[in-house]
Amino acid sequence: MKTAIFTVVLALAVFAVLSFGWEANEKALSEEFTELIHEKEAASETEARECRYFWGECHDHMPCCDWLVCRYKWLITYNICVWNRTFPEK
């Protein structure tokens, strides 16, 4: 009887150690994934755009892309880039 109880307690201790190890590994993987996402976001933010895209706010110092034109829309308080009914050449 004592051997059976000792075996059960020992098995529970082993399972507790294994689950703690898996949890620590999962947290480390989650942290690595979060760091990777932040690095990708930082890299994309540092890229300078040459022109403003569709529905983007535009001014003289922020030109629209070639297939867009800067127009004032009465529902919006600033100028936006809208389609000029042409297609960009590829």
UniProtKB/Swiss-Prot annotation:
One of its GO terms (molecular function) is toxin activity. The keyword Secreted applies. Residues 1-19 form the signal peptide. Residues 20-50 form a propeptide. The keyword Transmembrane does not apply. Disulfide bonds join C51-C65, C58-C70, C64-C81. It comes from the Eukaryota. It holds the Pfam family Toxin_12. Keywords: Disulfide bond, Ion channel impairing toxin, Knottin, Secreted, Signal, Toxin. It is found in: Secreted. One of its GO terms (cellular component) is extracellular region. Belongs to the neurotoxin 10 (Hwtx-1) family. 13 (Hntx-13) subfamily. Ion channel inhibitor. The presence of a 'disulfide through disulfide knot' structurally defines this protein as a knottin. This is U7-theraphotoxin-Hhn1j. It comes from Cyriopagopus hainanus (Chinese bird spider).
